[in-house]
């Protein structure tokens, strides 16, 4: 069957797949296809009732505020290592509780005056950590929060879409929000419009060119049908970037062991939100400590081979 790719426009014969909703275990089925030209795996038709598949608690809108002074200090050390490569104890803390979102900024060498816009930010956990590190020129936007959020530290999260944002920004980030957006071209064009000359858009996304997709197929946990409308490849992100007047400058794989244990659970018929799931009960006996450590080592190897199931894409305005 010939289907038109919504990323590159290819209308050739496309490989088709049927994916199930597996996070909540509802089992609804959705057809996807893999573009033969750009390699983007995409849902054939965006469900008219897409909102109902998010359910209660899909996103974490809880406050990112630190519970006490000790937590704030420990998180500060960890975050200093993630962003700036400083703090020996921070490196150790980061291995225990990683912040890949913050780590994605390191190659950009940001400073307190760097203007950073985060799109689809929820409660603003990413920006809150930056604000606590002394960054002041920050804004988060998300059209799905109930109302504007103002934190005591000065961070503001506005209830709006990126198309409604004004001003000029050095960095625009999408941390696992872009794959949920139906109109990919218009959204990236809006982000590109906001970038200062030489500015960078950082897209952190699931990647279909991955060991996890090759191994698990439609049981790959980050396929996440029907919420993930697009599972990109390097070529499909490059095509989108060119359409928006941006240049794909670098790709940094940052996948974790989740791609393996989550997919193994799906193969066993265990939804991500099931009481037996590691996502719900970290002490679950589903996988031994040895197995979990093996999943993390496997993820590190996949990242090194550019085959991890998620990555940060750096798109520069030139």
PLM-predicted stretches and their roles:
Residues 176, 180, 228:
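Histidine-centered divalent metal-coordination motifs
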Residues 185-200:
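A short glycine-rich, Lys/Arg-flanked "PGG" loop and its adjoining helix->strand segment in the class I
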Residues 31, 153-157, 218-219, 263-268:
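Short low-complexity, flexible loop/linker segments enriched in glycine and/or proline
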Residues 1-175, 184-188, 253-254, 282-287, ...:
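Conserved N-terminal segment of class I S-adenosyl-L-methionine
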Residues 19-23, 249-283:
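Conserved catalytic loop of SAM-dependent methyltransferase domains
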Residues 201-230, 235-240, 266:
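Short, glycine-/aromatic-enriched active-site segment of Class I SAM-dependent methyltransferases
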């Amino acid at each position: 069957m010939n289907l038109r790719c919504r990323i590159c426009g290819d209308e050739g014969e496309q490989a088709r797949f049927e994916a199930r909703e597996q996070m909540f275990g509802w089992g609804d089925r959705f057809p996807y296809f893999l573009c033969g030209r750009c390699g983007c795996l995409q849902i054939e038709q965006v469900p008219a009732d897409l909102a109902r598949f998010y359910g209660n608690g899909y996103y974490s809108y809880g406050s990112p505020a630190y519970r006490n002074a000790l937590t704030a200090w420990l998180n500060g050390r960890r975050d200093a290592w993630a962003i700036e490569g400083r703090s020996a104890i921070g490196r150790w803390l980061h291995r225990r509780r990683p912040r890949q979102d913050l780590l994605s900024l390191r190659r950009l060498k940001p400073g307190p005056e760097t203007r950073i816009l985060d799109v689809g930010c929820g409660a603003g956990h990413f920006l809150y950590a930056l604000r606590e590190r002394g960054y002041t020129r920050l804004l988060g936007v998300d059209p799905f929060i109930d109302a504007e959020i103002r934190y005591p530290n000065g961070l503001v999260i506005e209830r709006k879409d990126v198309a409604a944002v004004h001003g000029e920004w050095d960095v625009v980030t999408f941390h696992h929000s872009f794959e949920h957006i139906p109109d990919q071209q218009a959204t990236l064009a809006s982000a590109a419009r906001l970038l200062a000359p030489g500015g960078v858009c950082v897209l952190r996304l699931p990647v279909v060119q991955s060991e996890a997709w090759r191994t698990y197929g439609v049981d790959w946990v980050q396929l996440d049908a029907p919420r993930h409308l697009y599972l990109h490849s390097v070529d499909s992100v490059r095509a989108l970037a060119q359409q928006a007047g941006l240049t794909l400058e670098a790709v940094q794989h940052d996948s974790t062991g989740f791609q393996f244990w989550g997919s193994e659970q799906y193969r066993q018929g265990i939804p991500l939100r099931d009481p037996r799931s590691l996502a719900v009960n970290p002490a679950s006996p589903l996988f031994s400590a040895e197995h979990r450590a093996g999943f993390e080592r496997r993820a590190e190897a996949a990242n090194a081979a550019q085959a991890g199931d998620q990555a940060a894409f750096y798109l520069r305005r030139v």
